[in-house]
Design a protein with these regions (language model features):
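Residues at secondary-structure transition points
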Residues: 43, 47-51, 78, 108, ...
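Hydrophobic beta-strand-centered segment that forms part of the acyl-chain substrate-binding groove
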Residues: 61-93
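Hydrophobic beta-sheet segments that form the core/acyl-binding groove
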Residues: 81-116
Length: 140
């Protein structure tokens, strides 16, 4: 996708380096557990859209996990995808996320999923860097 561009963001503790171009691919085999009929998103035994979105989020999370400050994580905030084609039970689906933009704590990714026949979905995903303790304290 794009060449690497370096950004530094302020964590409140110390500066960390986050580079565009960071990439990760997550893979899953289509099974009874992740088809639309089981997940409740449809009534066919094909790879479910929610499963594709989760795989894309997993790839984005892992793309930047190694560069986060201690005590931080990322949380998904926006997903804009199209699910172009179905994937059959037994096929392998891979989702790749590429970090495209860093704006402070906001991370924007290009995401794409494919199976053995080609691209099955693509889109844009936004995650935010958060402090785990502060984030979880919002539950109470």
């Amino acid at each position: 996708f794009f060449g690497s561009v370096r950004f530094v963001y302020e964590t409140g503790i110390k500066n960390r380096l986050m580079e565009t171009g960071l990439t990760y691919t997550s893979t899953v085999v289509v099974s009874k557990e992740n088809v639309a009929a089981t997940m409740g998103s449809g009534d066919l035994n094909v790879f479910a859209t929610p499963a594709m979105v989760a795989l894309m989020e997993n790839a984005a999370m892992n793309a930047v996990a190694g560069g986060l400050p201690e005590g931080s994580t990322t949380v998904g905030a926006m997903m804009n995808t199209t699910h172009i084609k179905p994937s059959a039970v037994g096929d392998t689906v891979s989702a790749t996320a590429v970090l495209k933009e860093v704006e402070g704590r906001k991370l924007t990714f290009e995401v794409r999923a494919q199976d053995s026949k080609g691209v099955i979905g693509e889109g844009t995903h936004v995650r935010y860097i958060v402090d785990k303790e502060k984030f979880m304290s919002k539950l109470s």
